[in-house]
Amino acid sequence: MNTMTLTPGQLSLSQLYDVWRHPVQLRLDASAIDGINASVACVNDIVAEGRTAYGINTGFGLLAQTRIADEDLQNLQRSLVLSHAAGVGDPLDDAMVRLIMVLKINSLARGFSGIRLSVIEALIALVNAGVYPLIPAKGSVGASGDLAPLAHLSLTLLGEGKARWQGEWLPAQAALKKAGLEPVALAAKEGLALLNGTQASTAFALRGLFEAQELFASAVVCGALTTEAVLGSRRPFDARIHAARGQQGQIDAARLFRHLLTDTSAIAESHHHCHKVQDPYSLRCQPQVMGACLTQLRQTKEVLLAEANAVSDNPLVFADAGEVISGGNFHAEPVAMAADNLALAIAEIGALSERRIALMMDKHMSQLPPFLVKNGGVNSGFMIAQVTAAALASENKALAHPHSVDSLPTSANQEDHVSMAPAAGRRLWEMAANTRGIIAVEWLAACQGIDLREGLTSSPLLEQARQTLRERVAHYTQDRFFAPDIECATTLLAQGALQRLLPDFM
């Protein structure tokens, strides 16, 4: 099992990916303890001195002007968690819940939240024991933070709600007992610290980013395979073309294509002196389109990595000055906009792949048998597989609609502008699945096309990509049940079968 020492505010993208993919044993670096304790001492001083501070001894939202008596402060925090656990929809899977929990721990341990070390350690214990709170997927608008999802997470700490332990849904109290853990009682400020934050939104978008990286790599490999299958030119990948424009994403994308295609291959030599002057855009403009997508991936990475290490609580405790200040770090607009831009990239990766599939279907453009199968008429070949790819590409166009431009006021107009970041991030998962399906069809089609160039081979790396598929999916000599082959290729893509053929590009 992966073991990780968490130094608050210093999580890397690779660490976040590992948390998402695998269970983790987490420990908090000792450097965080003094800051955590200082913020708690500041909160305790405010209570002891009878000062009024939002979230510590007041109500919440529109009720922020209501002063809460000291004897009700503990009940205030518990009531906050219970009342805000109002999510709906299917439960998030363990991987997503684990990522949200680690992001929450990372934020709280920065020492600006006034939450005791013992509560943070209780969250760490949930992660280490594999106790996963039941968090419904829907119910947050991304301001004031992800209240409902984080309330459902926090229920388990209190021994309320449900949690999954060793694959079984149990009452949280029972799950804690089986894992050898005890519920906690929250002190002043702690319920609000647990609930306020962008951790669900950020986790949703991070999953989208992780999947987009795999899709980008897979599409580059399949685009290179298609270039070979239809006897496309290597000239559009010439480094001088891309240096002249100066777009770094484009320059780097072209380099990836050159890495795969190398200088030549038996296929390339076979049409070295052909009559074609230019290839269609779906081949010739791959560096330009994929480079623009790569730029979006990199910008999204920058935003999400900053947010993963951010303090998005409210109010914030500045212990050195003895102050508690209300602000708006819970507003997930940066995450929403990043997710919107990532959606455009995922849609375009799939759209370009679908156009290359369509190109291979047309015998006049591809110089291959119609629909990539011999004895056409009796055999339909890839005819409907291309239709499936077109359907998926079209779905993604609607899903790519920006969420960050939408807003509905909540909390009696106190919270009058919200980000919709959770929905912006969550739809990326469906878009990624659609695009992976498109690329799977292209992989099948491109390998079939190269097979049909009998006796000719591609570059070593592209032959490796073809062999990886052919170990699981046979060449099409005649029509057969097609869906299992798409499913097989899709599974291989999700496992990173093609991504590993490329150097790091992020």
Curated annotation (Swiss-Prot):
Gene3D superfamilies: Fumarase/aspartase (Central domain), Fumarase/aspartase (N-terminal domain). The modification 2,3-didehydroalanine (Ser) is found at S144. The keyword Cytoplasm applies. It catalyses: L-histidine = trans-urocanate + NH4(+). One of its GO terms (cellular component) is cytoplasm. One of its GO terms (biological process) is L-histidine catabolic process to glutamate and formate. PROSITE patterns: PAL_HISTIDASE. PANTHER family: HISTIDINE AMMONIA-LYASE (PTHR10362). Belongs to the PAL/histidase family. HAMAP family: His_ammonia_lyase (MF_00229). This is Histidine ammonia-lyase. It comes from Salmonella paratyphi A (strain AKU_12601).
